[in-house]
Amino acid sequence: MSNTDKERAIAAALAQIEKSYGKGSVMKLGQRPNIDIEAISTGSLGLDIALGIGGVPKGRIIEIFGPESSGKTTLTLHLIAESQKNGGTCAFIDAEHALDPAYAKKLGVNIDELIISQPDTGEQALEIADTLIRSGGIDMIIIDSVAALVPKSEIEGEMGDAQMASQARLMSQALRKLTASINRTNCITVFINQIRMKIGVMFGSPETTTGGNALKFYASVRIDIRRIGSIKDKEEVIGSQTKVKVVKNKVSPPFKTADFDIMYGSGISKEGEIIDLGVKLEIIEKSGSWFAYNKVRIGQGRENVKQYLKEHPQIANEIEKIIREKSSAITNINLDQTEE
């Protein structure tokens, strides 16, 4: 078959597929609109840089997992706030029945516009998510959490009944159904997950996430979030030092990490990240305990500089802009971004 005949045959096949399944069902990759991946900021400057595209990708499945009280829900509430700032409509499937509206509001979430559902079963939660995603009107949906998506058979059964892998089967079936709708509607779908210990593991990490392996495969981005220390004001604990690692990334190189502070009552401290990244990139000068920007001293001690940046948002925004512009250089400054 000559090249001309091949081209005619392909054109005829493409026309037939479009006639059967609608315009846009098949095309050449270069003709596809929005080849560049759009992203929504995570609310953390360091994590945006670690993700490689300035945030979480639209139209993809994201998994955020970690131990208890590590900041999983805080991070997702920041995601919602950032999406709403960009005019997005968000939904929160609260399977754990534990969302605190007052805390969400403090983190910048417009709770009057946030759609919330507190389903009784895992099937109900995933059906609600599927309906909202297929509507095309939702920009971001959070499912909190995979561990709380209890199958109906387990709820209706006796307390001691063995329900072998029923949750894993439920997740596998749901993700097969959801994945095409998520991509088509450009909806960011975030699953929060918990950690469990595997019994009898001699080598390697004994940790695993709940709900089987399906989510590990379908997720484009997997973020591991851990609390690594406390932030104290004299004797009072006022926040936690947090480390996140992008353990899977289909849109950029994986295994990059970021550190940030989560302050109780106000969430991720952007000012703290601006200071740390600014010093690493030599945008902010540090001499002993003093910090300076453009040869002008801006404070003594990290907490005082954080307060200065809060009171002078124009300077904070200016430094943040320079950090984002230099973000390509950050990969060379080793934020522990390669797997050890």
UniProtKB/Swiss-Prot annotation:
Domain of life per record: Bacteria
Ligand binding (ATP): G66, P67, E68, S69, S70, G71, K72, T73
Any single biological process term in GO: SOS response
Keywords for this protein: ATP-binding, Cytoplasm, DNA damage, DNA recombination, DNA repair, DNA-binding, Nucleotide-binding, SOS response
Stored PROSITE patterns: RECA_1, RECA_2, RECA_3
GO cellular component term, pick one: cytosol
Matches recorded under SUPFAM superfamilies: P-loop containing nucleoside triphosphate hydrolases, RecA protein, C-terminal domain
Pfam families named in the record: RecA (PF00154), RecA_C (PF21096)
Protein location: Cytoplasm
Molecular-function GO terms, alphabetical: ATP binding; ATP hydrolysis activity; ATP-dependent DNA damage sensor activity; damaged DNA binding; single-stranded DNA binding
Family designation: Belongs to the RecA family.
Name of the protein described by the UniProt record: Protein RecA
Taxonomic source organism: Rickettsia typhi (strain ATCC VR-144 / Wilmington)
